[in-house]
Amino acid sequence: MNINVADLLNGNYILLLFVVLSLGLCLGKLRLGPVQLGNSIGVLVVSLLLGQQHFSINTEALSLGFMLFIFCVGVEAGPNFFSIFFRDGKNYFMLALVMVGSAMLLALGLGKLFGWGIGLTAGMLAGSMTSTPVLVGAGDTLRNTASLGGQLGVEQDHLSLGYALTYLVGLVSLIFGARYLPKLQHQDLPTSAQQIARERGLDVDSQRKVYLPVIRAYRVGPELVDWAAGKNLRELGIYRQTGCYIERIRRNGILANPDGDAVLQIGDEIALVGYPDAHSRLNSNFRDGKEVFDRNLLDMRIVTEEIVVKNHNAVGKRLSQLKLTDHGCFLNRIVRSQIEMPLDDNVVLNKGDVLQVSGDARRVKSIAERIGFISIHSQVTDLLAFCAFFVIGVMVGLITIQFSNFTFGIGNAAGLLFAGIMLGFLRANHPTFGYIPQGALNMVKEFGLMVFMAGVGLSAGSTINSSLGEVGIQMLASGLIVSLVPVVICFLFGAYVLKMNRALLFGAMMGARTCAPAMEIISDTARSNIPALGYAGTYAIANVLLTLAGSLIVVIWPELPG
């Protein structure tokens, strides 16, 4: 039996889509030196190559893909988005605005200078900023721009072409910029990180390997009683001195949970909970020949839970003010906007932060009720909320606003982004509403993006050869300019206008570019994860601004001369 692969793929959109995705994801795993191509560019390259062979796909798949992606971007940004405006995020918002605004203005100027259409210009902006939200926002607005008429298909093809040509330029140039730009300024990042650590009482080396706490039991002897000198547990402050706390005491055969007024006596058997290294550092008064193995004494359920910060008595407070250890709980990590924060007592908590806390199940539940709620451990998505807010986003996107003779449609991108932000925000404030496991959210977002990339690549592939020779060199040079010049402008603005600490500034700049690989380089250069504070500050707002920039550049293009 002979199988014509070309006919098979042309006759089956679903098969063609997943062939493109499979080949593109394989290509995306390749590395060029320290730079990995990535899934989006891999799928785009494969789809462009197959598009040259006149393979095509149903455009509805393209629309559904971008809608899922942009909605999930909003859901991720929602928990921390509003805190950018209402707390101390003014500097971060301004940095993100300067980064995105300067890049958009440069792209508009270069597009007019070289006589490109809006498709190439918007695609170049998206690729140079390595930002799929720009691409998605521009693509959606193009489809809703009636004035393009017969040029719509050409501009959509040029959009993906501009993105494909400049994506690697944007990624590689930003990575090199992150590596070498800190060396060109007067303050080195390690010194800046240490400075902000001293000012805020942070630990510059607050990255550590996390272990779960363990429970071990010891018999109290004369040495330990002498060391305690008659003080009760509250006065002794055993946790401050040892890193462990006393969870249980067996005295005269009776097992009890001690309060702060308990005084140690000879013959007591005490259960200590702490990290393994804390047990190893215990004074010899505790452990030399005195460890006991008692099933009942050691029978305690240590759990690890993710607690979402929600309550007003925790939001805006320093971590030390929660007094987790006084309640017998251990903090393993802090996550904000999917970014791990410095693990330090002086980190200020935002609504939506996730604290990973270990300890006795009762104690962890008690502390969770004080500061927020325990994140649901279910793997079941609240599909009702997901679908309902998706519908709301589409309906909002249908709204049009008219100024004189100019009509502006909000569009699906902005509408779905708004609906996603609201769903994410409500989820951060109501533990049983709108739950979406992070793995499920990542999968839907990534799949939607890959479907969108496959669609635009197959659509644009047939015209790539004729367009590449006309704009290739100009496009690459413009991509380099749009990638690096806004970074320099943002640095000057942050350093000399906002007078920000350099470690926080460089982290915030990488957040404004939503580029995790460049952020890793900044952290390595600073020998600290303190720049993550700046990255988390700009990341959520930058995703929103980049989507709006993609739509805005298409809207204002016809109004510009030239």
Curated annotation (Swiss-Prot):
The keyword Membrane belongs to this UniProt entry's keyword annotation: yes
RNA-binding listed as a keyword: no
GO molecular function annotation: monoatomic cation transmembrane transporter activity
Species: Pectobacterium atrosepticum (strain SCRI 1043 / ATCC BAA-672) (Erwinia carotovora subsp. atroseptica)
Its membrane topology: Multi-pass membrane protein
Transmembrane segments: 8-28, 32-52, 66-86, 93-113, 116-136, 158-178, 383-403, 406-426, 447-467, 478-498, 537-557
One of the GO biological process terms: potassium ion transport
Protein name from the UniProt record: Putative transport protein ECA2683
Family listed: Belongs to the AAE transporter (TC 2.A.81) family. YbjL subfamily.
Locations listed in the record: Cell membrane
Lineage, broadest ranks: Bacteria, Pseudomonadati, Pseudomonadota, Gammaproteobacteria, Enterobacterales
Keywords per UniProt: Cell membrane, Membrane, Repeat, Transmembrane, Transmembrane helix, Transport
InterPro entries for the chain: AAE_transporter, RCK_C, RCK_C_sf, Transp_YbjL_put, YidE_YbjL
Cellular component GO terms, alphabetical: plasma membrane
Domain RCK C-terminal: 202-288, 290-373
UniProt-listed PANTHER family: K(+)_H(+) ANTIPORTER SUBUNIT KHTT, TRANSPORT PROTEIN YBJL-RELATED
